[in-house]
């Protein structure tokens, strides 16, 4: 289930990037807007995916301290 969620959110991010490419404001700064939006979506996805996967498969297993 964990890997599927990451892929589905990745597809959603790709879809949002494509939509933002065509919906970005037209004018002198069109390419700046397009790249800014696409990079924002990509960086947010990477931050989320790394955090999600780190919690899904932690490097150290939790241990119980006996008193």
UniProtKB/Swiss-Prot annotation:
Residue ranges, Cytoplasmic side: 24-35
Compartments where found: Vacuole membrane
A GO molecular-function annotation: proton-transporting ATPase activity, rotational mechanism
Membrane topology: Multi-pass membrane protein
Keyword Ion transport in annotation: yes
InterPro entries referenced in this protein's UniProt entry, alphabetically: ATPase_V0-cplx_e1/e2_su
Transmembrane segments: 3-23, 36-56
Lumenal side of membrane: 1-2, 57-67
A Gene Ontology biological process term: transmembrane transport
Pfam families noted in UniProt: ATP_synt_H
Superkingdom: Eukaryota
Keywords: Hydrogen ion transport, Ion transport, Membrane, Transmembrane, Transmembrane helix, Transport, Vacuole
GO CC entries: fungal-type vacuole membrane; vacuolar proton-transporting V-type ATPase, V0 domain
Tagged with keyword Phosphoprotein: no
Family statement drawn from the similarity comment of this UniProt entry: Belongs to the V-ATPase e1/e2 subunit family.
Oligomer and partners: V-ATPase is a heteromultimeric enzyme composed of a peripheral catalytic V1 complex (components A to H) attached to an integral membrane V0 proton pore complex (components: a, c, c', c'', d, e, f and VOA1).
Function in brief: Subunit of the V0 complex of vacuolar(H+)-ATPase (V-ATPase), a multisubunit enzyme composed of a peripheral complex (V1) that hydrolyzes ATP and a membrane integral complex (V0) that translocates protons. V-ATPase is responsible for acidifying and maintaining the pH of intracellular compartments.
Protein's recorded name: V-type proton ATPase subunit e
Protein species of origin: Schizosaccharomyces pombe (strain 972 / ATCC 24843)
